[in-house]
């Protein structure tokens, strides 16, 4: 948590409103400059602990630090921009007890239609996680999190959400559960999310910037210009391979970072950078370059292998292969505008039939 006194007080207050005694609330303050310490110091509850870093660690390192501070059986990472329903905590704990044999639990937020409790493992679990990808909503087994070798490097090299690497590591070692708890939803009125929860007004996903069809359309409008900017970074065929491997994460990162650079000075300050106008084209180019730099970094450290790369990155390609037929693939990609793009590149001779 950083410079978000109002959000921290709301989250802590909501959680501690629960009468359940089987959990603790730990706040890791990344050396905030606001009055969050003063406000939280007035909370007297044995379930609550407040820590302030002596220096600013940055978002990723503070996430790791906050998870290390937790002493319970499960670790639940909560972001300062989310709303937590303290009245549902007991229900969540009961479901976690049932899910004890699992390595990770993914929580659907209350703006999504909830289905039955689901168990998956390995690559299936990783694919499921794509659908519910958000840091708030991932609950880790604390013993397994602590046992991840060289865990710190995940928080050093990640360009966005380091818990993705942690989750992939755990998913490949055991079962994962997806449950609907009604505990969390994304903060209403923030710069990153413009659509209120279905609990408040009903959700029309087409109105939000994160709508897949919207961000895909805007992204592909820029692709011709992106291609000319990629000289010396990626060839077009390499871009295609990268796109197929990281389709979901690529588009998500472009849209998230574009919104953050242009609209969110508070969050950018947490990353030590000023707000400035950035085009979607520039974001696409920067993210591709960042992916290339990360790959080089892993190779230099001796932690990069083709097999590990396939496990960590080729999630969507594997999912598409499972559809088996060209017509099935087309039926999925065509509404998103992706099929037209792949067809165009193929006829340029960059994709083999």
Model-flagged regions — what are they?
Residues 53-70:
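Glycine-rich, basic loop-to-helix element that forms the pyrophosphate-binding segment
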Residues 269-353:
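Membrane-proximal basic amphipathic "stem/tether" segments
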Residues 120-209:
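Conserved nucleotide-sugar donor-binding catalytic segment
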Residues 7-9, 34-42:
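Acidic helix N-cap motif at the loop->helix transition within catalytic regions
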Residues 83, 87-118:
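Conserved donor NDP-sugar-binding/catalytic core segment of glycosyltransferases
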